[in-house]
């Protein structure tokens, strides 16, 4: 029995020793932290260094620091592993309360501290959370305040409401409630419809710097509400747009399919297989083509569409932009009878009936023009006759360039006559015509179709052009019967283009004169100083060539002028001073005509001519020698015309600017150069008499002569038309008055006759004698001239020519003082 008792005491003693040993190794790892709900309970939590049975091994003692206060013991509870928690019961907590805390492990004190509840407040969690879903699509959440109304925290709590979706934990939201009422209203539309949601709430007291309370128990509800009209409208608009787009696409596809299967099968002229002939270049003159700058601007496609859609609005602007008469106004050198220049269409389209056996498109190009004459000139003299392509590029300039080129061409043609006359300078052919006995001889004026007995075409028609030179003179020609001189060209319709260069520079020799009288066909007046017309037995005729346009004539003359090499013996300028012209004109004129000494001047002052005429008053006409004067006073020419029925108009002192071509081959015979023929034949003009220069010993000062001649020319002639100023007195009552020029009022002869072509002379008088040959010697004698000079020359008028008696101008008061001045009354 004793042995059994001793065996039981040994294990008990081991357990006691083990407990004592283990109690000595317990330590607090995290000191206790205490919070109060500021009502009746405070909660403390801590952690031990190892797993501990908190309820059996640890004790927490707390006591209010106040007189006669009693100490209280709290048995802790395990809070997950080594953690322990203990709830302290307190009565009516105030802000001044302060407690002491002691943690014991058996007989061992593990931790000692103090705790003030007013400084560590954690409100209680709200309760009774409820969700109301039947309030007009609005969610109402309500909960209860965890404190009674008499508590200090009752009116100082704020709340936070957490709502989340059960299906999607990420879909959660928190609403802060800062007002005192424990409720929250939210729109049901803010949440998804048809989904279950949960909500919970917690409280926080800001005045005591508290922490958030624990979450209240959650509540669940199913969110289902009626969607608003705005959302239905947005959805309806979206669906409607999609439907409209689908309908439009369906209609387009349907119409396209119907058009392809039904509408396109209807015959349409636009899709008919027709032949289109495209003319690349117009079959016209290069002068009629528009330049690149004058090409009308291409109308854009959108403007064409607008024109088709709105023709009434755009028709006025289109008509205003198109000005077809503008080009005709700007076209220079156009006669009165010629129609206005119209632009030529570069591209044309001709539609033919449908044909299967022909090609659909044929392009035609303009063939190069074959000009044998221009090729010969180019081979011999280096002409600049360009190819059609280069010519097309050259004439594609602006309208101003064309005007300038035409003006330059006219000046070149007019200036070229002073060096070449009617013959090419580089061609050694003579201007002299065959004698009268030759059957193949023809006169220079026969080259012009309008001259001669044939009926001349009207002024508005175009004349043909010849490039063949005149036939050279026969070896059997007699120099006594032929006399050749330069024939200047004058445009009577435009005084601005009178050949002023003919008065400055003369051709040096007759062999330099070219057989090119072609440009004179389209000019108005031709003045031969001494016509090279031989005595012909019978006139010959020239066949009528093919007509050409005036543009082609002008261009060909320009090409011929540029091709001429112009090898002159004495280089002269087109424009020279009048003094040099006086000095050089005598040598050149005497070399060409051979009527005077080589040192005499071709242009003399009028005073010197009048003075020198008194030396040899008995000599007159073409038979005068080289020492006789070419310019005679009119009283010297008057007495030699016995039986003249009526006076004729006084010659115009315009330095050869008012002469006209011969009337006809029958009336253009030259008088004999023998001394027996001192008068004028019936077919001659007074102005056509040769003008031999003054003798060398009677030449005056060139400067004085030039000044005197210029003053006389300026005083006697009109600045607009170039004719002599004539006035008629009251004593001319019985005569037919001379018609005044409509441009300047000067008396320029009988202008009442209808206009004719420049190359067609007016019909001669009934007796075959022109009006110029009917000068009356008695009516033309100015005062102050001796009767001896009047009887020195005579005229032989034709009988029956009384038609010119009505055109007698009156010239009086010739005064010669220094440089001769003349006054016309």
UniProtKB/Swiss-Prot annotation:
Outcome of substituting residue 150 to A: Little effect on IL4 binding
PTM entry text: On IL4 binding, phosphorylated on C-terminal tyrosine residues. Phosphorylation on any one of tyrosine residues, Tyr-575, Tyr-603 or Tyr-631, is required for STAT6-induced gene induction. The soluble form (sIL4R/IL4BP) can also be produced by proteolytic cleavage at the cell surface (shedding) by a metalloproteinase.
Region (Disordered): 373-397, 433-485, 651-703, 782-809
Outcome recorded upon mutating residue 575 to F: Loss of CD23 gene induction
Keywords assigned: Cell membrane, Disulfide bond, Glycoprotein, Immunity, Membrane, Phosphoprotein, Receptor, Secreted, Signal, Transmembrane, Transmembrane helix
Subcellular location, record wording: Cell membrane
Regions of compositional bias (Basic and acidic residues) in chain numbering: 678-690
Segment forming the signal sequence: 1-25
GO terms for cellular component: centriolar satellite; external side of plasma membrane; extracellular region; nucleoplasm; plasma membrane; receptor complex
Motif WSXWS motif boundaries: 212-216
GO BP field: cytokine-mediated signaling pathway; defense response to protozoan; immune response; immunoglobulin mediated immune response; interleukin-4-mediated signaling pathway; negative regulation of T-helper 1 cell differentiation; positive regulation of chemokine production; positive regulation of cold-induced thermogenesis
Free-text domain note: The extracellular domain represents the IL4 binding protein (IL4BP). The WSXWS motif appears to be necessary for proper protein folding and thereby efficient intracellular transport and cell-surface receptor binding.
Name assigned to this protein: Interleukin-4 receptor subunit alpha
Lineage: Eukaryota, Metazoa, Chordata, Craniata, Vertebrata
